[in-house]
Structure formats: C-alpha cells, structure tokens
Curated annotation (Swiss-Prot):
It comes from Rhodopseudomonas palustris (strain ATCC BAA-98 / CGA009). ATP binds at residues 30-33, 51, 87-91, 415, 496. This is Chaperonin GroEL 1. It is found in: Cytoplasm. Keywords: ATP-binding, Chaperone, Cytoplasm, Isomerase, Nucleotide-binding. Forms a cylinder of 14 subunits composed of two heptameric rings stacked back-to-back. Interacts with the co-chaperonin GroES. The keyword Cytoplasm applies. It catalyses: ATP + H2O + a folded polypeptide = ADP + phosphate + an unfolded polypeptide. The gene is groEL1. GO terms for molecular function: ATP binding; ATP-dependent protein folding chaperone; isomerase activity; unfolded protein binding. GO terms for biological process: protein refolding.
Length: 547
C-alpha cells in the first residue's frame, strides 16, 4: 500500500479552500446574461468554448492533491444540481464557495463546526420554504418561452422553440437536442408513435419517389413471435382482403414463406401490406407491443394469452388513420385506441418511472410515456462551425431542463432576487447557541453571492445593486444585468424555475457544510520516479562483425 500524506485542521482547510476558489472562480465568470465564456483545451480536436457551469467544473483538475479534493467536492455540487434540476450549476457553485469561505473563517475563529453545520441546515430549510411559498405556477406558453430564453443566456429564438415544442408534445413528451448539418436551428415534431424499425422489404414501398410505405386507414396485426409459415396467417389475410383496407404486420420477425407471400400479394395488387420488426428487445419489446396495441385499439397476439394466429378476427386488429414507414422508422398516426385505456397505461408507466432506480430504465420508460402521451420533438441545433454548434447545444439543453423544472415547481423572480428576498425569512430566525446562530448568518451572507456575481460580471458594483434592491419593498424588484436597469423582474420576464434555485442552494449547502466540518485530509504521496535504465554497456567484442 502506498504511503499517505495527511494534513490537519487549519493547514487542511487552507489547501481545500484554495482548490474550492480555483474551481469556483473558473465557473462563476459564466454567471448571468453578461457572463463570459470559458475556453477548454481538448486532447483531440478543436478547443471547446462554453458558458455552461458544469462543463467547466468537470474539466478542472489541480496538481496539488489536497487542493484538488476541495475542487472535486465543489464539482460534485455542480454535477448533483445538474442531475436533479438540469440547470443552476453556476449558481450552486457560487453559493458553495460563499458558504465554505465564511464557514472556514468561523472555524478559524474557534467556533464549533458541528454547530455551524446545524445553523446552515436551519437557515437553508427556511429559504427553501420561502422559495416554495413565492413560486408562481407556469400557465402560458409565453412564460415557458421566458424561462427558456433566460436559461439560454437571453437567446429569445431558443426560448420560443422550446415553448413551441412543449406545446406540441405536452409536458410528458420527449424533447431531444441534436446537432444539425445546416446553419439553421429548427424544431422537428413527430406526432403519433414513432419507433426505429423500417420495412422488411423494399417491395412494400408505395411512394417510389420518397421510398416510403404509406398506408391510410390501416389494420395493424401485432404478433409477439416470429412469423415464418403462411398457413396460420391465411384466415386473417383473407378477412383483410375482403375489407379492402391495407394491413401493417408488426412481429418479432417476418421471414421465409410468410414474407415471400406478402411481397407477392403486394406486387400483384391483391393486398396492400407491409411488415416491420417489433421495436425493442426481450421484455421491453413485449411492453412496447402492448403500448402499440393500446394506442391502436388492438390486441397483442401472444400465446401467453392463449390467442393463436389462426383464430384472429378483424376485431382483434389495431386501427390507425395513417401509417408511414421508411427504411429506418415507422410512424403510426391517430391510432384508434380508447382514451381511458391509454390514460390508464400512461399512469402505469408513470408509476414504474417513480419506482425504478436505473437511469437507463427510466429513460426508456420516459420514451414510452412520450410516445403514448404526446409525441416526440427534436431540436436540431445549427451553426457555422462545430465549436459554435456545441456551445449553442449546451445552452439549448440548459434551457430545456430549466423549462421542465419551471413546469414542475413554478417560477420565481430571476437574477438572484429570489435568494436575496429570502434573507428576510432567515433574518427572523434566532438561536440561543452563538455558534448555531453564526451558521445561520453564514447562509444569510451567502444569499447575496449570486446577485453580486451577476452584477460584477456585468461590470457593476455588486454591493450597490444589493443595497438598492433591498431598499425597495416590491418583492419582484431586481436588477436586469442585460440592460443595467432596475426593473420588475416578473413583468420583464426575468424568471428562474423555483426547482433550480431550491436545488442549487440545497446541494451547495450540503457539500459546503461537509467541507466546513473537515478536520483532516488524506492523500497519496506522489511516487518517486523510478531510476532510468543504465546505458547498455557490456556489449563489447562485436567489433569484428563487419558493420
């Protein structure tokens, strides 16, 4: 086991504080509408330019191991806030730095770190309660656009795009962000259910120009297993031919005689038919087939349910107004499923999302939910260069996360005003234990940190801004750093999601109070370099080899 280096009390805290400051100072320059960019070297390709706090935090690695530990703890704040709220990482970092700095001073002055921690927790609980009380529900599409715009650093088109996407796919819908090949940033909305399986044979194509299969008012046969023999399919095929409607077959696979017969029927014009493989794998495939069955008002043909293909009638088939299939995707639009059944399925999937502990499973369940409940929107981010596209994509993702958070818990005045106004709630708390009271006062002072930083990044003195806002008794009065004016933040549309503000403070105080109570730090001693190999002597006597 390698030897360790151990630092204690003041020495440990000083080193840790230096690390916290390096990381926080690199991150906090990005805060607010006039925040600057950070340029990050990449071992491959062009450097990356970003205004995203968590992206900067993840890149900071310090040489001194003790300083690095402090930096890593604050990086944890940014990552946790990003995971929970998806935005507010820079605010969380600024708050953590402020709490650690003040806490370290208090410990150096001889106060009890555990009492300080208790004071910090009491104050944070009061602030969270205050923020939740002030939060105003998001009602209109315009308010969603405002949240998106603020989070995308004042980029109004991005805010509008997110509002448009959320309006179309609903709050349950899935919105993904991708890079676009062109200069434009655009929204692509897929209505209905889309899954990533294309036609099994190009002979099914009905639109030769677009190479797609288009079926109007189609029947849909959903089968859990492979279809290879023809005999069992004949009764249902004959019934569909008599109805004169097209047919889509979704099964684990369609092969051999079954596929050949379908192709021949299609070419002869007897039956307008197409076949695709079922989406997903294993248990997930079965669940997705059941989703499609509910959406289209059909039944999944499964031997578990005792239904055989030979006994299938038209009533068991799903129906859809339109089905479009290309080489890679199938889209089912306007399925004939009953609304109460779809809603019951949606509730069931929501319950599974609550229960699952796996991020991957949660993501897949969320996708299934979106396909049933709303739809899928893709925001394609464009730009002149790869560096610009990546920077813009960071901002779009932040804005998207912020709008989702706003829909969940409502909005509060932005620009650090909500935290500053919460000072009143903390000011009412008093504690007989002077060290606990000192912990409460640490949070009281830290609540000013975000608004001071926003002002300083805009080139304005932070103390003056804080003083002016606190003088004014209007709760929503604040400082617009973009125009450098004092305005009503809600009226001007400068808002933050309550969830983002709350999460930023809770995560910052949680990690910062742990750092304040640190009394010793242990790190591995750097290994001494191994001595170099001696020069290759002793190879004499080779002179006669004629070289």
């Amino acid at each position: 086991m390698a030897a360790k280096d151990v630092k204690f009390s003041g020495d440990a805290r000083d080193r840790m504080l230096r690390g916290v400051d390096v990381l926080a100072n690199a991150v906090k320059v990005t805060l607010g509408p006039k925040g600057r960019n950070v340029l990050i070297e990449k071992s491959f390709g062009a450097p990356r330019i970003t205004k995203d706090g968590v992206t900067v935090a993840k890149e900071v690695e310090l040489e001194d191991k003790f300083e690095n530990m402090g930096a890593q703890m604050v990086r944890e704040v940014a990552s946790k806030t990003n995971d929970l709220a998806g935005d507010g990482t820079t605010t969380a970092t600024v708050l953590a730095q402020a709490i650690v700095r003040e806490g370290a001073k208090a410990v150096a002055a001889g106060m009890n770190p555990m009492d300080l921690k208790r004071g910090i927790e009491i104050a944070v609980a009061a602030v969270v309660k205050d923020i939740q009380k002030r939060a105003k529900p998001v009602a209109s599409s315009a308010e969603i656009a405002q949240v998106g715009t603020i989070s995308a650093n004042g980029d109004a088109p991005i805010g509008k795009m997110i509002a448009q996407a959320m309006q179309k796919v609903g709050n349950e819908g899935v919105i993904t962000v991708e890079e676009n090949k062109s200069l434009e940033t655009e929204v692509d909305i897929v209505e209905g259910m889309k899954f990533d399986r294309g036609y099994l044979s190009p002979y099914f194509v009905t639109n030769a120009e677009k190479m797609t299969v288009e079926l109007d008012d189609a029947y849909i046969l959903l089968h859990e297993k492979k279809l290879s023999g023809l005999q069992s399919m004949l009764p249902v095929l004959e019934a569909v031919v008599q109805s004169g409607k097209p047919l889509l077959i979704i099964a684990e696979d369609v092969e051999g005689e079954a596929l050949a017969t379908l192709v021949v029927n299609r070419l002869r014009g007897g039956l307008k038919v197409s076949a695709v493989k079922a989406p997903g794998f294993g248990d997930r495939r079965k669940a997705m087939l059941e989703d499609i069955a509910i959406l289209t008002g059909g039944q999944l043909i499964s031997e578990d349910l005792g239904i055989k293909l030979e006994t299938v009638t038209l009533k068991m088939l799903g129906r859809a107004k339109k089905v479009v299939i290309d080489k890679e995707n199938t889209t089912i639009v306007n399925g004939a499923g009953k609304k109460p059944e779809i809603e019951a399925r949606v509730s069931q999937i929501k319950a599974q999302i609550e229960e699952t502990s796996s991020d991957y499973d949660r993501e897949k369940l969320q996708e299934r939910l979106a396909k049933l409940a709303g739809g899928v929107a893709v925001i394609r981010v464009g730009g002149a260069t790869e560096v610009e596209v990546k920077e813009k994509k960071d901002r779009v993702e932040d804005a998207l996360n912020a709008t989702r958070a706003a829909v969940q818990e409502g909005i509060v005045p932005g620009g650090g005003v909500a935290l500053l106004r919460a000072k009143k709630a903390v000011g009412r708390i008093s504690n007989d234990n002077p060290d606990v009271q000192a912990g409460i006062n640490i949070v009281l002072k830290a609540l000013e940190a975000p608004i001071r930083q926003i002002a300083e990044n805009a080139g304005v003195e932070g103390s003056i801004v804080v003083g002016k806002i606190l003088e004014n008794k209007t709760e929503t009065f604040g400082f617009d750093a973009q125009t450098e004016e004092y305005v009503d933040m809600l009226a001007k549309g400068i808002v933050d999601p309550a969830k983002v503000v709350r999460t930023a403070l809770q995560d910052a105080s949680s990690v910062a109070s742990l750092l304040v109570t640190t009394e010793a730090m242990v790190a591995e001693l750097p290994k001494a370099d191994a001595p170099a190999m001696p020069a290759g002597g002793g190879m004499g006597g080779m002179g006669g080899m004629g070289f």
